[in-house]
Amino acid sequence: MFSHVTIGSNDVGKAKPFYDALLQPLGLVRHMDYPNAVGYGPADGRPQLWILNPIDKQAASVGNGITIGLEAPDRSAVDAAYKAALAAGGKDEGAPGLRAHYHPNYYGAYLRDLDGNKICVVCHRKP
């Protein structure tokens, strides 16, 4: 559905290690790396998630009501990504667990990145 998603950061240099840690358990790698932007995607693909300083040179700000949902291949990847993100400085917004009010197999975790952007890591598959 989406070509790409961008997440604004006020310090891309600090954001890179955070997103490296978060995305590695999901099988996503850096495809492009610039001083003010970094692009991630599947190893055999192209960058689809960009972390960057806003193009308009204004400060990055958090969108109220916005969550970026990243799909994990299995529940252990949700757990690993959540743990890695917290170890890299992320803030807990909901530990990994089943959230059957979304659907019976929704296993997800919620956190905030170093700039305060809300991220969800979720697996929709049966265990």
Stretches with model-predicted labels:
Residues 42, 48-50, 108-111, 120:
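A short beta-strand motif that forms the metal-chelation/ATP-contact edge
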Residues 9-14, 70-109, 114:
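Vicinal oxygen chelate
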Residues 7-49:
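Core segments of cupin and vicinal oxygen chelate
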Residues 41-80:
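Long, continuous compositionally biased terminal/linker segments
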Residues 1-16, 68, 124-127:
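N-terminal beta-strand motif that seeds the catalytic metal site of vicinal oxygen chelate
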